[in-house]
């Protein structure tokens, strides 16, 4: 494993000044794309994801529709300018295709697709800037965009990441920690139902460290959930003021 350019953890303080159990600054806006049925922008530190939802609408071609439920399609894409790496092709990479599938599977437990037979719901996610934890920021953004579109949902899905850095469990991996840490665990969590929808373990984790990581992920998800609720509330209040003038 390559040595990181700076110590990732020193004296209980991470390279970016955070404590191990601390999120980066979280910023959430809902209703950011006027021509989408629902949209949201989520930033975890420098990582920024924008999600747009279109639907429900009739499935085309019709033979792909399901008689008892809707079909949700998710596309995750990193903008060419989102990282310092040169992107040689505009076509989706294998990683983007894989993450698109992972995100769809993480969102489906929260979406009442049985309410939309023979219909489709399209979710488009664009990473504007990447500094670690892109898939979990995308998960939160997509969940909020679905809620903004008025899609029937059992709960929001909040995405957070936890990882192992110098043997310490840390919350919300930045790019350096993602690249040089010993392990990472992206988590999708429904705070009201207290259910996980995404657990992707990478690296060597002992039982105690894994339990610590899951507890820390729940703590982080509940923190983000409060900000997500506030963002939705602000969105609905703005709509009500626009309609009713109060």
Curated annotation (Swiss-Prot):
Species the sequence originates in: Pyrobaculum neutrophilum (strain DSM 2338 / JCM 9278 / NBRC 100436 / V24Sta) (Thermoproteus neutrophilus)
Self-association state and partner proteins as the record states: Component of the archaeal exosome complex. Forms a hexameric ring-like arrangement composed of 3 Rrp41-Rrp42 heterodimers. The hexameric ring associates with a trimer of Rrp4 and/or Csl4 subunits.
Name of encoding gene: rrp41
Entry keywords, A to Z: Cytoplasm, Exonuclease, Exosome, Hydrolase, Nuclease
Family: Belongs to the RNase PH family. Rrp41 subfamily.
Function: Catalytic component of the exosome, which is a complex involved in RNA degradation. Has 3'->5' exoribonuclease activity. Can also synthesize heteromeric RNA-tails.
Localization (cell): Cytoplasm
One Gene Ontology cellular component: cytoplasmic exosome (RNase complex)
Record NCBIfam families: ECX1 (TIGR02065)
Protein name: Exosome complex component Rrp41
Pfam families assigned: RNase_PH, RNase_PH_C
InterPro entries linked: ExoRNase_PH_dom1, ExoRNase_PH_dom2, ExoRNase_PH_dom2_sf, PNPase/RNase_PH_dom_sf, Ribosomal_Su5_D2-typ_SF, RNase_PH, Rrp41
GO BP, sorted A to Z: gene expression; rRNA catabolic process
Main location: cytoplasm
Annotated EC: 3.1.13.-
GO-annotated molecular function: 3'-5'-RNA exonuclease activity; RNA binding
């Amino acid at each position: 494993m390559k040595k990181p350019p700076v110590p990732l953890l020193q004296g209980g303080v991470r390279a970016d000044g955070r404590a191990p159990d601390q999120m980066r600054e979280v910023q959430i806006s809902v209703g950011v794309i006027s021509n989408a049925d629902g949209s949201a922008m989520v930033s975890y530190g420098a990582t920024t994801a924008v999600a747009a939802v279109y639907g429900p609408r009739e499935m085309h071609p019709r033979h792909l529709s399901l008689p008892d439920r809707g079909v949700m399609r998710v596309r995750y894409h990193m903008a060419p300018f989102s990282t310092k790496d040169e992107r040689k092709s505009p076509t989706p990479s294998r990683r983007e295709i894989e993450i698109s599938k992972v995100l769809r599977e993480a969102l489906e437990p929260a979406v009442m697709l049985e309410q939309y037979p023979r219909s489709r719901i399209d979710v488009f996610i664009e990473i504007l800037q990447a500094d670690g934890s892109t898939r979990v920021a995308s998960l939160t953004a997509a969940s909020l965009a679905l809620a903004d579109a008025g899609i029937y949902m059992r709960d929001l899905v909040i995405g957070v990441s936890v990882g192992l850095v110098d043997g310490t469990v840390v919350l919300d991996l930045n790019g350096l920690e993602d690249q040089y840490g010993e392990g990472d665990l992206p988590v999708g969590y429904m705070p009201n139902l207290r259910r996980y929808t995404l657990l992707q373990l990478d690296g060597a984790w002992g039982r105690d460290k894994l339990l610590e990581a899951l507890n820390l992920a729940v703590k982080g998800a509940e923190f983000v959930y409060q900000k997500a609720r506030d963002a939705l509330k602000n969105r609905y209040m703005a709509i009500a003021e626009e309609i009713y003038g109060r």
